[in-house]
Amino acid sequence: MLAEIKGLNEECGVFGIWGHEEAPQITYYGLHSLQHRGQEGAGIVATDGEKLTAHKGQGLITEVFQNGELSKVKGKGAIGHVRYATAGGGGYENVQPLLFRSQNNGSLALAHNGNLVNATQLKQQLENQGSIFQTSSDTEVLAHLIKRSGHFTLKDQIKNSLSMLKGAYAFLIMTETEMIVALDPNGLRPLSIGMMGDAYVVASETCAFDVVGATYLREVEPGEMLIINDEGMKSERFSMNINRSICSMEYIYFSRPDSNIDGINVHSARKNLGKMLAQESAVEADVVTGVPDSSISAAIGYAEATGIPYELGLIKNRYVGRTFIQPSQALREQGVRMKLSAVRGVVEGKRVVMVDDSIVRGTTSRRIVTMLREAGATEVHVKISSPPIAHPCFYGIDTSTHEELIASSHSVEEIRQEIGADTLSFLSVEGLLKGIGRKYDDSNCGQCLACFTGKYPTEIYQDTVLPHVKEAVLTK
């Protein structure tokens, strides 16, 4: 569904390259391919081997770099970031990469995808020790930990600092002479490494490699730190306490269909989810349609499995200005009609299966069901290609309270009545794992299922949780 309307948003995307004369330009194109991961801000920091130069701003990547600013960022290495704010707010000071300059130790740039669940505790400790924070972003915590580390080399300072962090993080760190890549011990966020000639490329999604012409090498492993400089790439471990738990929503919703995560194509996974959904809850109907864009693959899979024709029953308007999209519920509801239209010629007089990837608040689903009925659909059967999202996420998705999750307090039947569908079905957790290609009976399935099951792969600290949801979360 539409991220801006739906209220289900990912924090950001990161891209980095080392060893190319046009590193900032390539980073620009890489970030453009990751724009779906964040639209509130973008930035690029580059190094020429002696100094770091940067430009960043609020808005889309094309808005931030529109008046020749890109030509001012020069170097053979660069890291970039597109942001959706889930921690710290969306102000300019929080736009990444964050750049820290020191007369004694040189400069350091940080780009981060994820969310640190112990950031509040660490920040308080650092402030008690005299650290002064310039932003409200949890990313800045790492910079202060590095600065205060007692280790001699930057590599050891970073490894020591990373060992103190809890939560989800895919970090790109750049100095004048090297780029360092790190992924949390659970591997909650995707991060891949590739090659572009002799240059090393790192990105949140493999679709960025295709756009810039890079060749995929492998995934960055959980607990792994890569040190990339003019001498090549070296891999080290900063944690041996590994428990791979890739966010399931990356397959269901966030990532582009042409990306691969852990060797699994996102489009194929979503199509399989639709097939599993058909196995679990088929219904008699005349036409299947998907809510664009992220649900189309699942809808195709559902149609193939049931033999019901797939049709383009909903159209997305791609030219609604971003300034319209606001976080208020009233504008979010009105936004559905501006962003989506039902195709009367497809759905009129038909029993329609509407496939969507998830339900968060239920508001958008209700509006779309109403839209289909107004276009003449005689029945609307809603099929969701994921289990009910009943628990908050603290790892970088903008769902931090139970109150904003309708499945947290409503049964499936109550949700069906709320959205006005004839029937409503969610995919089971078992169906989700099988669709992605994981073993359901595996004690470590490789996926984070916390928003469905309430079982979090890391400790959840009290200050991470808003007071009115502490008790519910901390007892899981």
Curated annotation (Swiss-Prot):
Changing residue 448 to S: Loss of activity. In the C-terminal section; belongs to the purine/pyrimidine phosphoribosyltransferase family. This is Amidophosphoribosyltransferase. It comes from Bacillus subtilis (strain 168). [4Fe-4S] cluster binds at residues 247, 393, 448, 451. Binds 1 Mg(2+) ion per subunit. Catalyzes the formation of phosphoribosylamine from phosphoribosylpyrophosphate (PRPP) and glutamine. Its cofactor is Mg(2+); [4Fe-4S] cluster. One of its GO terms (biological process) is purine nucleotide biosynthetic process.
